[in-house]
């Protein structure tokens, strides 16, 4: 569960290392985001010569959360860290590579480009 002020790792090669959620998109009173949801983030830590720089405000898709993800078959999946992938206004990833596994739930939310770039889909 991601809410405002949550720090997330960045799971792509856009140049950002750490971001902070500043808004959960989807209604004025929407409080939490989970896997596949789009959030607005501020970049808190970035590498030199990256595509983004510290202080930029961007959109991101949440790809990993520490909170349990319950599936229809009763199984539960959980990750060690919260992570997101930066996207542009056309909902395409800014980076060209995705690091670490991503869950199948992204497919239902139509983030097919992220699924295809990911090394492992759980």
From Swiss-Prot:
Any matching Pfam family: Ribosomal_L14
GO MF annotation: an example: large ribosomal subunit rRNA binding
GO biological process: translation
CDD domains: Ribosomal_uL14
GO cellular component: cytosolic large ribosomal subunit
Keywords attached to this entry: Ribonucleoprotein, Ribosomal protein, RNA-binding, rRNA-binding
InterPro entries assigned to the protein according to its UniProt record, in alphabetical order: Ribosomal_uL14, Ribosomal_uL14_bac-type, Ribosomal_uL14_CS, Ribosomal_uL14_sf
Protein's UniProt keywords contain Ribonucleoprotein: yes
Protein family: Belongs to the universal ribosomal protein uL14 family.
Function of the protein: Binds to 23S rRNA. Forms part of two intersubunit bridges in the 70S ribosome.
UniProt subunit comment: Part of the 50S ribosomal subunit. Forms a cluster with proteins L3 and L19. In the 70S ribosome, L14 and L19 interact and together make contacts with the 16S rRNA in bridges B5 and B8.
Name under which the protein is recorded: Large ribosomal subunit protein uL14
Organism for this UniProt entry: Rhodopseudomonas palustris (strain TIE-1)
Lineage of the organism: Bacteria, Pseudomonadati, Pseudomonadota, Alphaproteobacteria, Hyphomicrobiales
Gene coding for it: rplN
